[in-house]
Design a protein with these regions (language model features):
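N-terminal export leaders
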Residues: 1-3
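Short glycine-rich phosphate-binding loop at a beta-alpha junction
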Residues: 114-118
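Extended, low-polarity segments enriched in aliphatic/aromatic residues
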Residues: 5-111, 122-130, 134-455
Length: 455
């Protein structure tokens, strides 16, 4: 009875709905400002959905097609940048970032610079991950291939990490099998159940986070939340490779664990995997605590930090398999343009998508619209919605878009100066047409442009 009452109370609060459609706020970023590219190949993700199998998992190559994922990644990068080749796409990515963030004209990548790839391994374990949603080995490898083979970053200068979790075996072997010098950073020393490096016969390239002070906050007194890995502080660039995933769901007996603390886990919250003291920030994002409507969000400070989010050259959402909660099995998305079957669960229809942008605010804005659209008219046999979006879901995006005039009234500061707009926030016109202001008016639109590519 207590659990039912708690779920009922939580559901009353899960009343999020997009407001003020096609009314962008903030300043769009990117070569093509505010552009978000969404690429889908339904044949890339083909897992059977057999949750009870111990030998058939979504992350296996027989279920997730590496060649198709690579093609999706290439199409995403080229459409995002307007380039005709992957090499040209990366040249434009680095040149744009170095001009915008470092004031360097016509400056591309130099081979002494480290590129960190920030991933979401919230459900990772040293011995394996079962079928909980984590960053996929296939998308991670596709990104590493792009960096090494097309951006010409030496493998030894690529650092893949989630400093709050341990790296699961399939991810290590997938990357090291092709790029032996790629480094990984995790939350602890290597564990004996983790695979040794096939090229070195030991744990070469698997490092624990070396915590150093690197982040400041515009409100509240935090201690360990100021600490980030030395390895990431030393990096020149960051790729924010997050998941398209909600964070809270009250009807979760099947999956176990608590209901969650906030609405979504995309590129904004992905930075929680970079700081030691994430528990210190939980109250600020928990809508049952300090995360009230239009409250201060530490996500803004993490996104603006010169040692963290301000290093970002590319934002991407792995949406091959999406989740409804921080601890979640893959979820079918039944509504357009995905049109997955939801019953029986054991079927091969999945979101099977990648989304990317130069503008993290724009990307998460699109992500929220996608998640919300999939929550509509989507009920299980108990008449529970299969996915819910918790209240205040887009508040942090409004704060990021206008930190100099934030709805919370917070004075966001970095290095003693007001934090400028971190991107543009907007909701699409409707779930049916999915049009943003730059789609409707390419010449005068000031918000997001969404490009959908079906492969």
């Amino acid at each position: 009875m207590i659990l039912m009452a708690k779920a009922a109370l939580r559901t009353k609060l899960d009343n999020y709905g997009p407001q003020h459609r096609n009314m962008p706020v903030g300043v769009a970023r990117g070569i093509c400002p505010g552009r978000v590219v969404w690429v889908r190949d339904p044949k890339a993700a083909q897992w059977s959905g057999n949750l009870n199998s111990t030998v058939d998992h979504w992350w296996m190559d027989r279920n997730t097609d590496q060649a198709r994922v690579d093609a999706m990644m290439s199409a995403t990068l080229q459409k995002l940048t307007g380039a005709r080749t992957d090499e040209e796409a990366w040249k434009r990515i680095f040149t744009y970032y170095n001009q915008l963030a470092r004031g360097m004209k016509a400056r591309g990548y130099h081979d002494d610079e480290v590129v960190a790839v920030e991933i979401n391994l919230n459900n990772s374990a040293a011995a394996g991950i079962g079928n909980y949603v984590n960053e996929s080995p296939q998308v991670t490898l596709a990104m590493v291939r792009q960096l090494v083979l097309h951006a010409h970053v030496p493998a030894s200068k690529v650092v893949v990490y989630d400093a709050r979790r341990i790296i699961y075996p399939a991810l290590l072997t997938k990357i090291w099998g092709e790029f032996k010098d790629v480094r990984f950073v995790q939350n602890q020393e290597s564990q004996t159940v983790q695979p040794v490096h096939p090229g070195y016969g030991n744990y070469h390239g698997l490092e624990p986070a070396d915590w150093v002070e690197g982040v400041t906050y515009s409100a509240n007194n935090y201690n360990e939340a100021k600490l980030i890995p030395r390895q990431i502080k030393a990096a020149t660039y960051l790729v924010n490779l997050a998941l398209l995933k909600a964070h809270s769901y009250p009807y979760s007996s099947e999956e176990g664990g608590d209901e969650g603390q906030t609405a979504i886990s995309m590129t904004g919250k992905n930075h929680f995997g970079s700081i030691k003291g994430t528990p210190e920030l939980h109250a600020a994002i928990n809508t049952d605590n300090d995360g009230t409507p239009h409250a201060y969000s530490p996500i803004v400070d993490l996104a603006a930090s010169p040692n963290q989010g301000a290093k970002t050259i590319l934002y991407m959402l792995d949406a091959l398999y999406c989740g409804r909660r921080h601890q979640s099995y893959p979820l079918h998305f039944p509504n357009p343009p995905l049109n997955n079957r939801v019953e029986p669960y054991a079927n091969t229809d999945w979101p099977s998508s990648l989304l990317a942008s130069y503008d993290g605010v724009s990307l998460d804005s699109v992500g929220i619209d996608v998640l919300y659209s999939q929550s509509q008219n989507n009920f299980d046999k108990n008449q529970h919605p299969r996915i819910l979006i918790r209240e205040n879901a887009d508040d942090y995006l409004q704060e990021e878009a206008t930190p100099d005039n934030a709805p919370s009234g917070t004075k966001y500061m970095e290095n003693g100066k007001p934090t400028p707009s971190l991107g543009v926030f907007e909701h699409w016109d409707s779930d049916a047409t999915r049009q943003y202001s730059r789609n409707k008016d390419p010449k005068h639109g000031q918000g997001i442009e969404l490009i959908y590519i079906a492969m």
